[in-house]
Structures are given as structure tokens and as C-alpha cells.
């Protein structure tokens, strides 16, 4: 990741998401509904739901919206049945892309995802074509200036797999998915605040893109993220 600012990339991504807040709320409501349906409405027993609600709070979503989404998931209110689907593909210079969706119409979703790839210079791949290039893990990012020694001690004691110091001074904590909430709680109780905390498909290595390639790749990623059925887009491209 040398030469690329993890911190700048995250801040840029958050800024773009803030511009699309209404769409972000819609995606979060779907995630909360599915999480509650799969694991119940108890946050202490449902880490996926807790993470979705944390993201909703970060996006300033009203609590009434959150509660209605939970009730739709648990069956207290009538709701739509969503299916989880993952698509894989390629962008510029063979960079890998994973597209995670929640949909009530698989035919519509695959057509829209394929169109976004084709229109913006990418290609859809087959199942498993790029997933092996990523690791499913908990991921937390901390601003430059965060105490490395303190974060490392707290995180590793709580069960984190690794604490990475990036060239820009930001710190990244990686956890096994089942231990994400436990590590997050320990870090929070130590008075340290993550700027990003999520469960993600993290690339094992990154492909550096610059100039026109980076611009084209960003356009492709934006097109995919803007689709209503798309929840998350992951890539191994460093832009």
C-alpha cells in the first residue's frame, strides 16, 4: 500500500457517501431488516444487526426508521423478503471487484449489475473468480496520531489478528469476523475512536491505478454503488 493514503481514500469515500445520504439510508434499512430477520432483534445476540445500527447512527438515520426496519425483519411489521447475492468481476488493469446485493428480484439485479460493468469498461466474472483475492474480516481504521502502542495492546489482547501502521500514519485493526464486536468494545472502552468500523472483504494485495485508469475505475465503482440493490462494493484497486 506504499504510495497510497489509506486515510485519504477512506475520507474520500465517506464524503461521497454523505452526498448520497438518502440512498445510504435505503441500503441501511434493507441491511437492518435482513439482519433482524436472520438473527433476531436482540443486539447483544446479533452482531450483524448491531453493526448495521451503528452504521445507521453514523449516517444520522432517525431511530424511528431503525426500529421499523427491525420490526419488518422480526415480522412485527409486514416487509419485503430480500435475497443476498454476490457478483464478482473486473475493472481497469484486471482489478478485482466484489458486489454484494440485497434484492427482491434477482433477474433485475443481475441485469443492472452487468449493465454497470459493461457500460463502464468492466467485465462480470463467474462465482469465485475474484473472491479468493479478498479476506472476510472485521476492519477498523484510526486517524493518524492515534497511539499505536495503546491501540496495539488493547486490540491484540481483545482478540484482533493484526494492527497495521500505514505510510500516512493511520492505523488499521483486523479481526476475525466472530470477534469483531468484542474487539470494537474493548477499543471503545479504552477511549479510542475508530473512524471506520465494519465487516468487509479486504484485499490481500492491492493494484495501483493512476490517471485515466483510476478515473475510469472510480466511475465504474460509483455506477455499481449507485444501484438500488447494491449494498457494498469491494475492490483491490488502490486509487
From Swiss-Prot:
GO CC annotation: cytosol
Record's keyword terms, sorted: Cytoplasm, DNA-binding, Transcription, Transcription regulation
Main location as per UniProt: cytoplasm
Region (Disordered): 1-21
Any one GO MF annotation of this record: DNA binding
GO BP terms, alphabetized: regulation of DNA-templated transcription
InterPro entries given in the database record: Integrase-like_N, TACO1_YebC-like_2nd/3rd_dom, TACO1_YebC_N, Transcrip_reg_TACO1-like, Transcrip_reg_TACO1-like_dom3, YebC-like
PANTHER family: TRANSCRIPTIONAL REGULATORY PROTEIN YEBC-RELATED, TRANSLATIONAL ACTIVATOR OF CYTOCHROME C OXIDASE 1
Entry's family note: Belongs to the TACO1 family.
This protein's name: Probable transcriptional regulatory protein Pnuc_0618
Species assigned in the record: Polynucleobacter asymbioticus (strain DSM 18221 / CIP 109841 / QLW-P1DMWA-1) (Polynucleobacter necessarius subsp. asymbioticus)
Amino acid at each position: 500500500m506504499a504510495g497510497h493514503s489509506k486515510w485519504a481514500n477512506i475520507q474520500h469515500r465517506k464524503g461521497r457517501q454523505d452526498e448520497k445520504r438518502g440512498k445510504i439510508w435505503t441500503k441501511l434499512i434493507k441491511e437492518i431488516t435482513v439482519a433482524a430477520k436472520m438473527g433476531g432483534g436482540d443486539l447483544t445476540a446479533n452482531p450483524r444487526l448491531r453493526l448495521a445500527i451503528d452504521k445507521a447512527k453514523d449516517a444520522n438515520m432517525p431511530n424511528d426508521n431503525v426500529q421499523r426496519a427491525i420490526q419488518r425483519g422480526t415480522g412485527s411489521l409486514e416487509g419485503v423478503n430480500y435475497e443476498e447475492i454476490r457478483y464478482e468481476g473486473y475493472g481497469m488493469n484486471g482489478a478485482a471487484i466484489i458486489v454484494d446485493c440485497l434484492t427482491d428480484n434477482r433477474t433485475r439485479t443481475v441485469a443492472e449489475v452487468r449493465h454497470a460493468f459493461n457500460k463502464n469498461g468492466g467485465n462480470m466474472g463467474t462465482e469465485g473468480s475474484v473472491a479468493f483475492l479478498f479476506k472476510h474480516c472485521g476492519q477498523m481504521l484510526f486517524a493518524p496520531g492515534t497511539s499505536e502502542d495503546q491501540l496495539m495492546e488493547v486490540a491484540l489482547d481483545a482478540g484482533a489478528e493484526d494492527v497495521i501502521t500505514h505510510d500516512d500514519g493511520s492505523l488499521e485493526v483486523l479481526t476475525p469476523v466472530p470477534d469483531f464486536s468484542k474487539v470494537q468494545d474493548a477499543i471503545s472502552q479504552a477511549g479510542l475512536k475508530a473512524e471506520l468500523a465494519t465487516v468487509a472483504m479486504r484485499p490481500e494485495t492491492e493494484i495501483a491505478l493512476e490517471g485515466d485508469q483510476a478515473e475510469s475505475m472510480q466511475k465504474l465503482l460509483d455506477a455499481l454503488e449507485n444501484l438500488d440493490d447494491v449494498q457494498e462494493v469491494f475492490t483491490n484497486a488502490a486509487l
